[in-house]
Amino acid sequence: MPGRNIVKKNWIAAAAAALILTIGVSQQAHAQTYNLTLCGASPGGLWTLLGAGIDAAVKKSFPGSTVTYQTSGGGLANVGLLNDKKCDIAIIHDAEAKAGVAGLPPFKAPVDSLATIAQLYTWAPMQIIGSKSYIAENGLTSLEDIAAKKLPVRIVLNRRGNIVRAVGEAMLNAAGASPKDIESWGGSVTYAASNEQGDQMRDRRADLMINSLFVNHSSIRELASAVDLAMLPITPETAQKVIGEWDIQDFTIKANDYDWNDKDILTLTVSAQLFARKDADPKMVKDVTQALVDNVADLQSVHKAMAPLDVKLMSQAKTVPYHPAAKEVFAAAGF
C-alpha cells in the first residue's frame, strides 16, 4: 500500500532528523571548552600547584579546556588584575580581598567587582613563635603579656607589602603592643621575608616571629633543629578585634602538632579563595564551580597540605559574597 509506505518513510525520516538534532545538541553541550587565565602568585609555590589542580578539574569536566596560570605579585596584585579584567579568575587571600573591598591600603578606593567562587584552604595560621628561653625568662603566656610587661622585645613580621604583615601588625595592635609601643619600650619590629625571619631567629637577632605558615611547615622544623622554640597564643578578645577588622577566621594549633608544644594555641588564619568578577559570564562561573565540586580530588592531590579540602569548606567563605552562579552549585550540593 503506497500511502502507508509513504507515511512510514516520512515517520522514519522525521525520527532520524530528531535523533540527529538531539545528538548534535548533546555533542555541542559536551563540546563546551574554556580558555581561562588564572592569576596566582610567584612560580613554584602552593598556588602554582592549586592552579594545576584547577586546570585538571576543568579539563576533566570540559575536555579541551585550559586554565593558564599567570604569575603575579600575589593576592593584593590579583585584586587589581581581576578588577582590570587582566585575568578571568584569581586566587586571593580573604584579608587581601577585605583590603580591596574596604579600600584599605594599598588600595586608594574600594574595589566592588569581586565575587567568590570557592574557598580553597583555611589552614595557614598566624604562628607566634619565639625562643623558648626568652619566653620562659620573661614569663610570657600569651602575646598580650608583652604589653602588660612593656617588654623591649624584638619581633620580626613579614615584609612590607605582604598582607600577612598587616595582619601581624593588627594582632600586635589588638594585644596592646603596637610597633610604636614596642619601640617606646626599647624593642623593635622589623620586616623580612619568611626565609629571612628564620635567619634572624637563628642568629638571635629576633626574639619572636609572627608569620602565616602551614602547621609543621618545613621552615619551622628547620628552625626548631637550631633553636629551642615555644609558641604564644592570643586571647579570644584579641582574636575578635582582628576578625572584626579583617574578616578572617580564628584557628587553633593543636597540642602536639609540634613535638615542642604541649598546649592548644589560639590564633588567627588567612584563607585562600578563588574569585571571579561579579559581571563574569554566569555559565563560566557555574561550570568552573561544578568542575571543582565534581573533581575536588584533583585539588586535594596537588599537595599533602590540601588533603582536608572538601566541598563543604569550598562553600564556607565569608569575606566577599559568592557569585550567584557559584552559590547555585553549592546549594545543589547541599551547602
Briefly describe each language-model feature range.
Residues 112-161:
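A conserved helix-loop-strand patch within extracytoplasmic ligand-binding domains
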Residues 175, 196, 203-204, 208, ...:
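An extracytoplasmic/periplasmic, membrane-proximal ligand-sensing/linker region
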Residues 94-96, 104-105, 116-118, 132-135, ...:
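Pocket-lining segment of extracytoplasmic ligand-binding domains
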Residues 47-64, 168-173:
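Short, polar/charged alpha-helical segment
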Residues 39-44, 130-131, 150-164, 191-192, ...:
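Short beta-strand->loop
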Residues 15-24:
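Bacterial N-terminal signal peptides
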